[in-house]
């Protein structure tokens, strides 16, 4: 069975984020099982409805940006918003184990904003719906838990990191003379080089599929 990491980009998430200052608190009751740890499900971010509304996360996915206490090390947790109006405004709760592992503490200040990108792993029968699709094709977002949206395939790569190219037909793996990305970034104008790449079609050998949410 294929094992795909689906990377989802949201083109309508503003690059200049609407940032909400929040207190991030670890909660041992929040789910953090193997499905979350292995990337099959997003971590849970619990907050009240007013906090959620401030960032306008229309797909219910948000990112918390934090700094490890006493350092300049940045830590991000991207997860699924669960509304709980028993939680105070401008407070976000995440699994305590996850927070301590990431930051070394169970409570700290953070910045909350609408996620620009996230990823979900699938390795069950849903993978069969993607095999054979090509760069530029679209599939239903429900495959990765997104309702009422289509995801457009922008590219991908295999387990050796060789990228898919839209101009190479089929599910092939071969060396191609390239003058630009993906697969080759020339250092000089006009430079060309033969590089190993993947074709434009998803096969079981692909491990990452890059997608973008399509808005009508």
UniProtKB/Swiss-Prot annotation:
Which keywords has UniProt assigned to this entry? Ribonucleoprotein, Ribosomal protein
The GO biological-process annotations, alphabetized, read as: translation
Task: Enumerate the PROSITE patterns for this protein.
Answer: RIBOSOMAL_S6E
CC terms in the record's Gene Ontology section: ribonucleoprotein complex; ribosome
* InterPro entries, A to Z: Ribosomal_eS6 (IPR001377), Ribosomal_eS6_arc (IPR020924), Ribosomal_eS6_CS (IPR018282)
Residues crossing the lipid bilayer are none
Q: Report if keyword Ribonucleoprotein is assigned.
A: yes
- What GO molecular functions are on record for this protein? structural constituent of ribosome
Q: What Pfam family is a match, any one?
A: Ribosomal_S6e
* Top-level taxon of origin: Archaea
Q: Which HAMAP family match?
A: Ribosomal_eS6
Task: Family membership, please give it.
Answer: Belongs to the eukaryotic ribosomal protein eS6 family.
Any idea what this protein is called? Answer: Small ribosomal subunit protein eS6
The species this protein belongs to is Staphylothermus marinus (strain ATCC 43588 / DSM 3639 / JCM 9404 / F1)
Gene label:
rps6e
